[in-house]
């Protein structure tokens, strides 16, 4: 049997329902709203990556460029509980580091909200 293929790509607005599902599974009452994800994907100064396996969204990371600095902030990162232990968080962190290098960030920071 073939192993499922995992893809890492930039998020699209159409991904929001699946992102919300992961968000609610991981953070429950502290989860972000649909409007917050629309902003993060469409209008923020940053980037948003998702991990997809067989057309199912299983993880994401939202990165923001901190205004007035050369800092890249991890705003939110989550892996669906059913998919933990598969190094998906590591994959997202590696992409975060690549993004920081590409944009010549001086530092990677994390949000205190999640």
Regions found by a protein language model. Name each.
Residues 106:
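Short acidic/polar active-site loop segments enriched in Thr and Asp
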Residues 6-8:
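Extreme N-terminal starter segment of soluble prokaryotic enzymes
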Residues 10-84, 93-95, 99, 103:
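Acetyl-CoA-dependent GNAT
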Residues 113-114:
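Conserved small/polar residues in nucleotide/adenosyl-binding loops
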Residues 1-3:
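Short, conserved catalytic or adaptor-binding loops enriched in Gly and charged residues
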């Amino acid at each position: 049997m073939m192993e499922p293929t995992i893809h890492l790509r930039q998020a699209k607005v159409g991904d929001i329902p699946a992102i919300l599902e992961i968000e609610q599974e991981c953070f429950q009452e502290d989860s972000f709203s649909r409007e917050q994800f629309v902003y993060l994907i469409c209008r923020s100064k940053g980037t948003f990556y998702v991990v997809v396996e067989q057309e199912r969204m299983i993880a994401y990371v939202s990165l923001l460029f901190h205004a007035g600095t050369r800092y890249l902030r991890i705003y939110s990162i989550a892996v669906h509980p059913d998919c933990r232990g598969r190094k998906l968080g590591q994959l997202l962190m590696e992409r975060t580091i690549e993004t920081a290098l590409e944009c010549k960030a001086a530092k990677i920071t994390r949000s205190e909200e999640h």
